[in-house]
């Protein structure tokens, strides 16, 4: 399941809340951080970072970039890095676990002028295409802001796309565009309205494409805002409606 949206819409917050709910329901969850700029997702999840990112484990950005260049020169369609794998087979070098909740970072921008994030997109795409999960297992993918991951093909290996829509024109335009792209790729799609109050709910709904399935509505929460400001885990924050959202996805 891929979660996207504009910057500040609450993607990482929703990923964390859904992951916690799934964990408490007895599922095994891996959260994949595909945002090369996000630095604090593990904190709100309540999971320690692993020793290295997946990109580092594969030899670093230079190694992956070299493979991509080789693919272009040979006119191959895509990079092949991974064989078929399960959650249990993933190395503890790049995945950290808190009971049945795991956390994996694809890669991060570490230096000035190090270049684009395309190699990270290629790694994420191939990883998601080769990971196989059981019925009680979930993978939640937290993406960077916008829709660049659509262009990189990251959505290729996911079953469901969720766009987080906060009260802004940018969020509405992005949701409608993402819905169009997801439909072109025959992907299940839904939206979660976030930071909502009664005065704007109907306005927001009226501006979204009428074919978009609204999975749920989450009110603005000062508890979430304070937890995020302090860098605390959202483990103790209660939000109504998460079970209903998961039922819509199932």
Which residues are covered by each model-predicted region?
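Hydrophobic anchor at the beta1->P-loop junction of P-loop NTPases
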Residues: 3
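Walker A (P-loop) phosphate-binding loop of P-loop NTPases
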Residues: 7-8
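Conserved lysine of the Walker
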Residues: 11
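Conserved catalytic-core segment of NTP-binding enzymes
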Residues: 17, 119-217, 225-226
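N-terminal phosphate/diphosphate-binding loop that engages ATP/GTP or pyrophosphate donors
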Residues: 23-98
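Residues in the short beta-alpha loop(s) of Rossmann-like NAD(P)-binding domains
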Residues: 35-37, 195-197, 221
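Cytosolic-facing regulatory segments adjacent to core modules
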Residues: 79-94, 102-139
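C-terminal boundary of histidine-terminating zinc-finger modules
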Residues: 228-239
